[in-house]
Amino acid sequence: MRSDTREEISAALDAYHASLSRVLDLKCDALTTPELLACLQRLEVERRRQGAAEHALINQLAGQACEEELGGTLRTALANRLHITPGEASRRIAEAEDLGERRALTGEPLPAQLTATAAAQREGKIGREHIKEIQAFFKELSAAVDLGIREAAEAQLAELATSRRPDHLHGLATQLMDWLHPDGNFSDQERARKRGITMGKQEFDGMSRISGLLTPELRATIEAVLAKLAAPGACNPDDQTPVVDDTPDADAVRRDTRSQAQRHHDGLLAGLRGLLASGELGQHRGLPVTVVVSTTLKELEAATGKGVTGGGSRVPMSDLIRMASNAHHYLALFDGAKPLALYHTKRLASPAQRIMLYAKDRGCSRPGCDAPAYHSEVHHVTPWTTTHRTDINDLTLACGPDNRLVEKGWKTRKNAKGDTEWLPPAHLDHGQPRINRYHHPEKILCEPDDDEPH
């Protein structure tokens, strides 16, 4: 297979950029409605084809670049360099694996795993949502279905997709699945593969959506817990003294105006709160498993504003004050940017430095990383082998993968404001910020942009 030169690749991308710039400058006032729709259709074809052009680049990166060269995983490198979400980066990698050309161990080119789907995308006949439906089909299809039938099914779905909307394709794929695998996937292995719970991002009001698939065992366990804690009258936050251990009496049941979904929420909260308070979860990264929250003295005194947990969640001050009365949590206070005090409701042999880092950094300090404090390690900005000291002013938080980057050419240092700067090796330096503001959105909105490379 012929390989294009760097000059040819650069020239092709330059020509593509110039052509698109010309299209962006077009004034389409003279076109009729049918002509406008035809133009949009042509643009959609090219939008779809661009996705196919990325597959070879992504697969080559996956095959030749190590984490040291990328500055992390391929998923992280794509997310940070292209300014896309990690989820979108994962989607593109998975699509490239299925639709991009591959190479054998001997170097010989291999066709795409979903050959017909890849060909349809290259021609611009199907888009991202069509591909998603076809990938979902094969994710559910039993491994017992032989290769010939799988290839025929893929070719049929790809052909159907070229003349239908993705939502219409879904119904056809479902029918095809029923014909090929009428009994469904009911094995323990299939159930274990599909299990999972996801918490969505916090919305503006602080609420979070939860979704997922529960195994029969987890469902049975939750049912047993909620039968007690989510019963009418139980764990009612509107009661002055909520009934938790005992059986609610008739008055408690009568006072309870919550919906079943609200009772489930409150019962789950009561169960997890009791588990935290029991102390039976042991330790996590050197601290007893508990809730760590940071806030300012001004907000605490005014009983307004929000605290930030070690997991990166925002907690309204009213909730924070109520939480402090129920369990052994930590509350770190700041006067401006300076740590003021550390309060906790139970004497524990725990590293105070880690708690203050939870409050100060809130998460991994490497730019582009969104790992919260609960998932981060303590990192010595100046290597311990140099100072032989563990000084709070020379510590920061870094997730495991980023912590290991320091051994692969990355350097860290503190600036005059006490922020941690991450300096990449020369081959990874493309002018990215040195300071991570992801965990401190208030600094991005209220302070001048002073974290540019220098």
Swiss-Prot record:
Residues 364-405 form the HNH domain. GO terms for molecular function: endonuclease activity; nucleic acid binding; zinc ion binding. Pfam families: DUF222 (PF02720), HNH (PF01844). It comes from the Bacteria. InterPro entries: DUF222, HNH, HNH_nuc. Residues 415-434 are annotated as: Disordered. CDD domains: HNHc. Belongs to the Rv1128c/1148c/1588c/1702c/1945/3466 family. This is Uncharacterized protein MT1995.
